[in-house]
């Protein structure tokens, strides 16, 4: 009887061992499903245009979402001009030199961004579209009317310091600060913004400067060009890096 009991206990032990081995084998053969990367992209605006606010839920969704830019981009550009640049231009809205200067600012961005493989089309936004007191919402609506995917707004401010010297040529030093924001028109989100400041110092050249005012303009225009060259490069780099 004792031998029979020992036999049953031994058989029971083998069954338990077999069950554990089977369970362990099943556990080892289990392969968890791969973790999916978050693909939650924001596809529409969550801003309420009526009261210019956004709900708490909208804030959370925006902060938890990503912006997916198109592979090919229609880019609208607006020069949100500052009055600081017109100090040397009488009746500046009709002054040919001033208008050419403003156009040259836009050309810096056009030249830099037109060679970007993602930029399909560059659209210049006319000033008459934005009115006298534009805000971020009305600017977005203007970009929609141009069917732009992205909207680049830039502005330039500058100041000049002039030194009169008794026995040397006069000098002019100018500082320019350029600001830019890039808006995703579909969502109203601004994925890129930057501020660049540069300085430029020149000495009065009697061959080309008829007055000290010409020297100051030359210094100012040089500083502005430096800021816009750098700023346009940063915008271009952002568009290249975006996936």
List each language-model region with its residue ranges:
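C-terminal motif of bacterial Sec signal peptides marking the signal peptidase cleavage site
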Residues: 16-19
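Bacterial N-terminal signal peptides that target proteins for export
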Residues: 1-8
């Amino acid at each position: 009887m004792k031998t029979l009991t020992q036999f049953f206990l031994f058989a029971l032990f083998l069954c338990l061992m077999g069950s554990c081995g089977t369970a362990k084998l099943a556990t080892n053969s289990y392969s968890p499903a791969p973790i999916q990367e978050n693909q939650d992209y924001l596809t529409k605006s969550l801003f309420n245009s009526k009261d210019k606010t956004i709900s708490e839920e909208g804030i959370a969704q925006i902060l938890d979402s990503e912006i997916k830019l198109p592979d090919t981009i229609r880019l609208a550009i607006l020069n949100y001009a500052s009055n600081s640049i017109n100090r040397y231009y009488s009746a500046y809205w009709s002054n040919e030199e001033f208008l050419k200067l403003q156009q040259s600012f836009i050309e810096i961005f056009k030249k830099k961004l037109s060679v970007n493989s993602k930029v399909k089309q560059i659209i210049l936004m006319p000033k008459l579209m934005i009115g006298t007191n534009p805000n971020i919402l009305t600017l977005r609506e203007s970009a929609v009317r141009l069917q732009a995917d992205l909207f680049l707004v830039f502005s330039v401010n500058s100041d000049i310091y002039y030194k009169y010297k008794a026995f040397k040529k006069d000098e002019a030093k100018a500082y320019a600060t350029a600001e830019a924001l890039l808006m995703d028109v579909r969502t109203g989100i601004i994925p890129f913004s930057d501020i660049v400041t540069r300085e430029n110092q020149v000495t009065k050249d009697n061959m080309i400067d008829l007055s000290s005012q010409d020297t100051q303009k030359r210094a100012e225009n040089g500083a502005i060009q430096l800021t816009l060259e750098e700023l346009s490069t940063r915008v271009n780099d952002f568009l290249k890096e975006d996936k």
